[in-house]
Design a protein with these regions (language model features):
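RNA-binding basic/glycine-rich loop and surface signature characteristic of RAMP-family CRISPR effectors
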Residues: 1-355
Length: 355
């Protein structure tokens, strides 16, 4: 029987009073079954966080991106294309995929689908997350002499200090304090899913009718030791084994130990990984880390998180998981073992002889 080409991963994370995606302070969607708003992090943000972690682990720069803008006849700046380098020498390009479609149609479009299919990070169950609001203030009223206040009238003219004082008579306002109400925050138990297509993980197609890379890049990769292999997708170039073996441990680390930090200057959460399930059968992941509705004869439904070690997937339960889920098998080395499981599976795949 042919080896399974996919590795499926489900991770369970805890987030506390933080911000994922900024849209009205925190992106959310409405769950129609339980009539609640639930926060989420988009798959794009999860993917970017994983790739940023990967670059940090390897100590390499991200791939360069070209941003194009057009100035129209009226002198206004218009949005143009955003073009990737389409260079698999960059690990974030190789694993993240790319698309390059220059304006004008004179250059052939080049595109590669990522070998990592990554879900949005959503609540384990709609009833196991929250979207609380926080009212905050930007307050500098303790040292008013150190700061400057500028008040403008309806025409944009700056008022004098005397005019400002006259205006404030009868107005209970502080000019050194900004009130910022209704800031949504995310909290609760969240899951993300990853499917790793090992057939394309370290391979790029050489087909020039629907190209992933240019003909020049094909020659460049061959010169760097990439070898021609035949896969289910046709002729491809495979990364040298020694380079793969350097990347695989970093990929495993990044998939387990990423955090969202882009919006968290003052709402940082550890986003600790509580549990991990790994399998070559996607169905077993949903059973291994799940929630169950509880009927306790109360007006509001409740949900209980469950880690099931007998659902067909290999599960790894970290110590912090016991804060939120009743379990007897949590261990200090759970994530180390999960990392090794991912490494072993990726190392075992025969990238040169896929057919």
């Amino acid at each position: 029987m042919k080896q399974n080409s996919f590795i499926y991963l489900r991770g369970l994370k805890h987030a506390a009073f933080t911000v994922f995606c900024v849209e009205n302070c925190q992106k959310f969607y409405y769950d129609p079954q339980f009539n609640v708003r639930v926060p989420f992090s988009s798959g794009q943000q999860v993917k970017r966080s994983v790739l940023e972690k990967l670059n940090d682990i390897l100590g390499v720069q991200p791939s360069p991106t070209e941003f194009y803008f057009d100035v129209d006849k009226k002198g206004a700046l218009k949005e143009g294309e955003v073009l990737s380098s389409c260079d698999p020498h960059y690990v974030d390009q190789l694993l993240g995929g790319w698309m390059r479609t220059p304006k004008g149609g004179k250059e052939k479009a080049v595109k590669r689908r990522s070998p990592l299919s990554i879900s949005a990070m959503t609540p384990l169950h709609p009833l196991l997350s929250g979207l609380p609001k926080e009212n905050i203030s930007f307050d500098r009223s303790d040292r008013p002499n150190a700061h400057k206040v500028v008040v403008r009238d309806a025409n944009g003219n700056v008022l004098t200090d005397e005019q400002v004082c006259n205006f404030l008579d009868g107005n209970d306002r502080s000019l050194y304090r900004k009130w910022i109400p209704d800031n949504n925050r995310a909290t609760g138990l969240f899951v993300y899913d990853v499917a790793i297509d090992q057939r394309r993980l370290f391979c790029v197609s050489t087909n020039q009718f629907e190209p992933e890379i240019t003909a020049d890049m094909v020659e460049s990769l061959k010169a760097d030791g990439w070898t021609v292999v035949n896969t289910a997708f046709g002729e491809c170039l495979s990364m040298p084994k020694e380079q793969r073996e350097q990347l695989i441990p970093a990929i495993a680390d990044a998939l387990l130990d990423w955090q969202i930090t882009s919006n968290q200057a003052r709402t940082f959460s550890l986003m600790e990984t509580l549990a991990v399930a790994v399998s070559d059968n996607a169905n077993t992941l949903a059973a291994a880390i799940r929630a169950k509705l509880i009927d306790d004869n109360e007006s509001k439904p409740k949900a209980r998180p469950i880690i099931d070690e007998n659902a067909g997937a290999k599960t790894f339960i970290a110590l912090p998981c016991a804060n939120y889920i009743v379990t007897e098998t949590e261990s200090a080395d759970a994530l180390v073992r999960a990392r090794q499981e991912l490494i072993d599976r990726m190392m075992a795949f025969d990238y040169e002889n896929q057919l």
